Amino acid sequence: MAITRRGLAASGLLLGGPRPARARTQWRAASAWPVANPMAQLLRRFCEEVDEASGGAVQIQWHGGGDLLKSRDIRQALQQGAVQIGDISLAAHSQGNPLLELDTVPMLARTPDEARRLAAVTRAAIEQQLQREGLTLLYWAPWSGAGLFSRFAIDSVGSLRGTRMRSMTPVGARVAGLAGATVAQVEPEDVPRAFATRQASVMLASAITGVDSEAWQFASYFTTLSSSFSKNAVCAQSRAMDALPAPRRALLREVAGRCEAAGWDGLQAAQAAAQQVLSGHGMTLNPPSPKLVEDFERIGTIILGEWIERAGAPGQRLLDAYREG
């Protein structure tokens, strides 16, 4: 029987025997959120599942609690290759891009189902934007609904006039301005100090953020407004992702899909758990009054109109698709 080159290759005898095993991939992943935070834990799960599913061929060292990078630094570190995977707040680091701010517009998506539909409608456009910045979206996950942390009961936007409202997003800053509050730009890890030094007196944030910052130390009330459900994006540096062999890229995407589904499916449980922690530490959880809802709807309408002006026709098409959904 003739011995062919193809047969030699198949048997591993060509060029002196079998090819050496492909080199192990070793990456680093950074999250600024506290170790017990659901976002940080989801990224940890991603890293562990990738290691297990790849049989150790892809190892991603997880860094949580901001021990490697602060939230403000992760995006740039990703782009420069200091880390290969990072957990970033889209709205906080939008750099003026309206597309990345849409999920923080007040009263546009007030339930987990609405937030999930908005995410689905905007995903392709956001992926393209991130690619232009050298980032590849692996998965994203939502925060629980945004509410108001304060030392006093809030019945209307009038209650916010003259306060110092903590914000870390452009939309949040605009909300503060329209409510008659002074904006206090404060990163997540600096929230307790900002309240202790009176740099901030009110915060529009999720119950999960309240747990992270131990809001019971500086607030007595959490008004469960659910004005928006913002998202975090876990991204890979595109150059590092593209350099992976195709099977490894596929594996990362497969695990990312499972983590994204877990983030959405676990949202209501995470929100309930966070609210229970706040209540357990003596905070009063109040539903929003009809007047407060009306006031925030008015603010949301103004901000959405401004958003459409900046986003133009492409943004309007996304909004139409969301509303028709």
Language model feature labels by segment:
Residues A2-I3, G7-E114, I126, L130-G325:
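N-terminal secretory/targeting leader peptides
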Residues E114-V121:
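A gly/proline- and charged-residue-enriched helix-loop-helix capping module
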